Amino acid sequence: MSVQQQQVDLRRTFAIISHPDAGKTTITEKVLLFGQALQRAGTVKGKKSGQHAKSDWMEMEKERGISITTSVMQFPYNDCLVNLLDTPGHEDFSEDTYRTLTAVDSCLMVIDVAKGVEARTVKLMEVTRLRDTPIITFMNKMDRDVRDPMEVMDEVEEVLKIKCAAITWPIGMGKEFKGIYHILDDEITLYQSGLGHMIQEKRVIKGLNNPELDKIIGNYADDLREELELVSGASHDFNLEEFLKGELTPVFFGTALGNFGVDHMLDGLTKWAPKPLPRKTDLREVTAEEEKFSGFVFKIQANMDPKHRDRIAFMRICSGKYEKGMKMKQVRLAKDVKIADAVTFMAGDRSNVEEAFAGDIIGLHNHGSIQIGDTFTAGEMMKFSGIPNFAPEMFRRIRLRDPLKAKQLQKGLIQLSEEGAVQVFRPFINNDMIVGAVGVLQFEVVVQRLKTEYKVDAIYEAISVATARWCTCDDERTLEQFKKKSGDYLALDGGNNLTYIAPTMVNLSLAQERNPDIVFHSTREH
């Protein structure tokens, strides 16, 4: 087996998806703790003490306690090398989260057992369905008062249309939470509260019928045995093939805050989650084992380091090997670039990379020439597909407090739009800058970042825009006529793509009727 093949086999690249406040950032901390990446997990609760969660590093995130940008963290666990992509949990950041899900091979779904399946989880699961991504489930907060675990598993099956296979099962809940039974290993791990910040010495009892169990947890032992009979009747057996097709999810229980049950889930993930999978391009399918390098950019993050005022393009390597100083082709521009200083991340802490393999995420320094969706190869002119832009759902006009800063405003907005934080439209008929987003919080982020990173003081005004559509037409003359006729409603986006800005949905319908040869797109591939 070649060194490259060995390296590919080691890798597991996954993202965590959940509804806000289900405990995603906490579980990220604990996963890193097990990966020895953090000695003491900086729980999100310790905000006032200045001990911020490692994966929430942007100013606004530190203030609010929400993960806005996607962090990437790599750590070793169980003879595997795990790449964890932390996605924004806040519902206003669905586009960024969506794109991150194009860069992973599996997902960990975190569910708050007190609340069950929530809206955001449903939306994210729809996205994973597009590529049938394998899903592992962690039922969180068992040390709180929660709903009946069986009921929540039924809800997952019914709402998310995925079979559940219980791998572990909780003993008690809330204040009476006693531990976890591992169904496949036939062993009980006993829970001790107050030790969430460290890796605990495990107290394990072998065998469900061990009399030791009755001694330690009393009547809970009989309750557990009864429950497990019900579970074996109602739950599905774990089937690796169904899991890899995205049809069945292994379910683990625990408490991320109490750092309990997380290791069971990690064991399952490293054992069952797929190694780097093949990827489609416009020409062919690329496998991770191929020797020649290829990768695509799924995110651009501005100013990760205020000291460096730079931008980093996050690239998922799909095949081959990155080596320091290597040449690669940037397909969109058909030009060769030498990459001498790619970085890996530990959420804001960087280290330079000597080599990286398929499944790894590396950061390229970007001075404006790299865009989301860019493909880099060893020379082949192919493009990875499936990294979409969505038409925004909310719009604002942006105004300067100081008119002399117009140039800085334009530069800042174009950079932020290339990064995918927001979409920018410049109408044909005036000098307005219209900003489009998927949620309100994105607007706040943009104003704050314009201020701190570009020294531009800007405010928003309401604007009557219902939606935007990208316009294309195969016939150049028809397109030119359309531009003349509909100029009042047309704009260019940040990438200079022609866009129809509709004041109402009725207006859009009429425009589509009157211009049957023009295609109005609600999504656009990067």
From Swiss-Prot:
Its main location: cytoplasm. The keyword GTP-binding applies. InterPro entries: EF-G-like_DII, EFG_III/V, G_TR_CS, P-loop_NTPase, PrfC, RF3_C, RF3_dom_3_sf, RF3_GTP-bd. It comes from the Bacteria. It is found in: Cytoplasm. GTP binds at residues 18-25, 86-90, 140-143. GO terms for biological process: regulation of translational termination. Residues 9-277 form the tr-type G domain. GO terms for cellular component: cytosol. Keywords: Cytoplasm, GTP-binding, Nucleotide-binding, Protein biosynthesis. One of its GO terms (molecular function) is GTP binding. NCBIfam families: prfC, PRK00741.1, small_GTP. Increases the formation of ribosomal termination complexes and stimulates activities of RF-1 and RF-2. It binds guanine nucleotides and has strong preference for UGA stop codons. It may interact directly with the ribosome. The stimulation of RF-1 and RF-2 is significantly reduced by GTP and GDP, but not by GMP. Belongs to the TRAFAC class translation factor GTPase superfamily. Classic translation factor GTPase family. PrfC subfamily. This is Peptide chain release factor 3. It comes from Colwellia psychrerythraea (strain 34H / ATCC BAA-681).
